[in-house]
Amino acid sequence: MSVGNLHNWYSSAGCEIEVGRTGQISDQQDGLRWPAFYRVQDNQAAKGLWLGAKNFYDPVVDKEYEHKVVHAGPRHLDIVGETIPIELTMYGRYDHPNVFVDGDPSTNLQYLDEVDFVNPDLISDRKIYNEVQTSMGVKMKRTIYSFAHPEHQNYHIQEYVFINNGCFDKECEIEYQQAIEGFQVYLQYRYAISREGMIYDGNWLPQSAAWGHNTMNDVIGEYPNNPSSNDQFYDDGEIIRGLFSWHGYHSSADPPENLGGPDFGGDGHLGAAQFVGVTTLHADTSPSDNSNDINQPTTTWFITSDDPTTSGNQQYNGTKSTKEYVNYMTVGHPEQSHAEIVGTGNANQFNDPRTGSNPGGTSQGIGFGPYDLEPGDSIRIVLAEGASGLSLSLIHI
């Protein structure tokens, strides 16, 4: 999706996993490009989408699980038997212009905006519709909107609808209708800001910054009924429920004043002045009540990016699923956010209070639920993911 000043790739499996587009380690940072009019402005390293439930019967293996979790990312992906792509279609209000020189495309950007269908009545300049069947009897419909308007070109709106359809494979040859108890939606965001100064490009920032080792993550609005001093509010008084991340201090930076990623060995311009993040626009209160529940998300704990649960996921391992569901997906809110704990210290030296280590940096998680879904029930969650920061003229002062 590459209109406006924020570009990102989207996967047919429903989530953008680590090196999931090209498979190349040099593309550790790939996506969420802002400002996208300039090269190597990627801020995204990996994402994860986990769906969980409790007291769940799985007809595929004829087994009752205390907890069942299916995964797409941040590393694991099974598109045959877990998160199964059904559709990925790009709609455009208009197609992109075609620019040729002597019969050849003038730029590789020609291939980054492939519109499948043109609809001049779209509310956005681009829309991606993505449908995924999961192996827990839930279908996900994901719709992503992007805009080219100067005041709306730095965010994408992402709408998720989860439907208890009872299907466990692509063709619904395995079908079992049941009430789904404690349905939880859990997303992980691993940001690395930004690619310009990292090892595979400008190479003036510490190597591990390329996988987000020094990324700082903060959360606001987690207690709407008891706001804190740093919470923010919309013009109508509603609290903003969001997470945001930036390039923090790194112990190997030389000199150590590396906020903004200055190119000290070159012209001194800032190569990591972006802030990126996600805000919750809407989360259904229940399948029967579509009003916006301001107490969602119910989980805002951070997770270290190399935590054992971020790889080797197994949907039929009940012990692992229980650990994921209880210790990560539904764990609630920490007393302090990751950024509050790190403070003015080096973010790459932060140790997770739960695991005692942190070799790969820290990701931010948000969890929605729990919901109880009867057969045919659905719930809807709407997020906005965006990026902003200093303008090009300011980072070169």
Feature-to-residue mapping (PLM):
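A long-range scaffold signal marking pre-active-site subdomains of enzyme folds
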Residues: 1-394
